[in-house]
A protein has these predicted regions:
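Membrane-embedded transmembrane alpha-helical bundles that form the catalytic cores
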Residues: 1-509
Length: 510
């Protein structure tokens, strides 16, 4: 199924959806979602069904234990109530932990077995990695934890819960949805603005097919070459191309599926917010893969930072290092834990683990030094408030992020270190030629224009201008001209051929 076929499937399903009575539209969406999944990953169907069923049953069991405990409390004497509450909570915790271990364990076995075997030099087994398993597992476990924490009641209808887990646009590469944000929308959807939805889909296709897939040969030429082939200058060009390719590939795919969801009147969670305009690494991660960051914040960072062991450690640190250090310590340790897990989420290999730790340690040091930064900013208020300093912070963050991208893209951590070392030790600027980068002069010009257009639209968005909303509000002839012209441009300028399909999304098999 090509990207255009995916878009066409979305339009066809939306047409059937809106032709049906409102009360059965969710059934149409469920059938469309399972039809899509079966067509793309039939062998993976039992796994998504298993996650759906076990999560649904576990959430109901947690609710029943809570209801039973409340009934017993009403009839119990005062001195026994505390014990009854504690017993009910222990049973709920046991159910929750069993479901977490089962589903995350299944994900770990399927996703990391070959990586772990590689540590010991064993050959890969090639286990099946079901479509979207990371995304639907995290989404389902978030729902389970919310039910356990009493945020909302569980969904009693298995089919309706199955729709939440399997909603087909977000299965490809997210975003990771929250049940309380999607429940009502999946039941009936909201207002549909077809021009806005189409423009978002078109923009996603343009980012993916015109920019990301055109930058891909440059990235491959640099990072997939034998070690020592290129000097540091080519490494810099390669990582800059990768920063463009990865952003346009991932955010382009998100825009496409978010546009498809809007055809049903469903608004998916924002997953990217112009990350390369970030002024710090923390700001970057609040703009990049927002739904994963929010998941980690709510279900890992806060529970860890507020846990009793960390609180005791913070109190112990207060006496030796001061109150400011003690206050920042839980956040520092939490960031290291979260980004270690984010690194492993990408893969259990040295490059991903070090990439996660690189980000986590920088954020940890930033948290610990925050009081000093604050005092420095107060002393240099005029400088830090200037436009030039803002630009400096954006460029500094971009450099920090791109250093991390070396670990993300290289095959091993050692390769990443060697490539970065070559930037200073062996630049070899003469190697930077289009023929070495595997891209023609015409493709280079198209890529440059595409990146400039992306930068212009992003800059407008950063300044509060809604380009899509502005275009969708134009007169009908202008809207049609933009949509038709954009479609023709993507058809003419998009990269076509074998290997350039939705399967080539970087995050397709996460």
């Amino acid at each position: 199924m090509s990207l255009f076929m995916l878009a066409a499937y979305g339009f066809a399903c939306a047409a059937v959806y809106h032709l049906c009575p409102a009360k059965i539209r969710w059934v149409v969406l469920l059938l469309a979602s399972y039809g899509f999944y079966a067509s793309r990953s039939l062998a993976g169907l039992p796994f998504i069904l298993a996650t759906t069923g076990t999560t649904w049953l576990a959430a109901l069991a947690i609710a029943r234990i809570g209801e039973s405990g409340k009934a017993r409390l009403k009839a119990a004497e005062k001195e026994r109530k505390k014990a009854i509450r504690a017993a009910a909570r222990r049973r709920q915790r046991a159910v929750m932990l069993a479901a977490l271990l089962l589903n995350f364990g299944l994900l770990a076995v399927l996703k990391y077995t070959d990586d772990v075997r590689g540590w010991f030099g064993a050959s890969p087994l090639g286990l099946l990695l079901p479509l979207g398993i990371s995304f639907y597992t995290f989404q389902s476990m978030g729902y389970l934890l919310d039910v356990y924490n009493g945020k909302y009641a569980p969904q009693r209808n298995l089919a309706r819960f199955a729709l939440f887990v399997s909603f087909f646009p977000q299965l490809i590469q997210g975003p990771i949805g929250r049940y309380d944000q999607l429940e009502k929308q999946l039941e009936g959807g909201g207002q549909v603005d077809v021009p806005r939805a189409f423009l978002l889909m078109l923009w996603g296709l343009a980012k993916k097919m015109v920019i990301a897939d055109r930058a891909l040969p440059m990235v491959s030429a640099v990072f997939d070459a034998p070690g020592g082939t290129w000097g540091g200058a080519m490494a810099v060009v390669g990582v800059l191309a990768y920063s463009v390719q990865q952003y346009c590939d991932f955010s382009g795919g998100i825009d496409l599926v978010a546009g498809i969801a809007e055809l049903f009147g469903i608004r998916l969670a924002e997953n990217f917010r112009r990350p390369y305009f970030a002024v710090s690494l923390g700001d970057f991660w609040r703009r990049w893969h927002i739904s994963l960051g929010a998941w980690m914040r709510d279900y890992v960072f806060y529970p860890f930072a507020l846990s009793r062991p960390v609180s005791r450690l913070s109190k112990a640190a207060k006496g030796r290092f001061g109150a400011a250090f003690a206050r920042a310590l839980p956040a520092a340790l939490g960031n290291i834990l979260v980004f270690a897990l984010v690194g492993v989420w990408h893969g259990a290999t040295s490059n991903y683990i070090l990439w996660g730790l690189y980000n986590g340690v920088i954020l940890a040091v930033t948290a610990l030094l925050e009081p000093r930064y604050k005092r420095l900013n107060e002393r240099c208020a005029r400088l830090t408030a200037s436009r030039g300093f803002h630009v400096f912070r954006v460029l500094r963050t971009f450099v920090i992020v791109n250093i991390g991208w070396f670990f993300d893209r290289c095959a091993t951590a050692g390769d990443a270190v060697r490539m970065m070392g070559g930037v200073f030790a062996r630049p070899e600027w003469a190697q930077v030629r289009l023929d070495n980068l595997g891209i023609s002069p015409l493709d280079a010009r198209i890529l440059a224009v595409g990146v400039l257009l992306l930068a212009a639209v992003s800059l407008l968005g950063e300044n509060g201008k809604d380009v899509r909303g502005w275009l969708a509000a134009r007169a009908l002839p202008i809207r049609w001209a933009v949509m038709l012209g954009g479609t023709i441009a993507v058809l003419l300028l998009g990269v076509w051929g074998s290997g350039f399909s939705e399967a080539s999304f970087i995050y397709f098999n996460f």
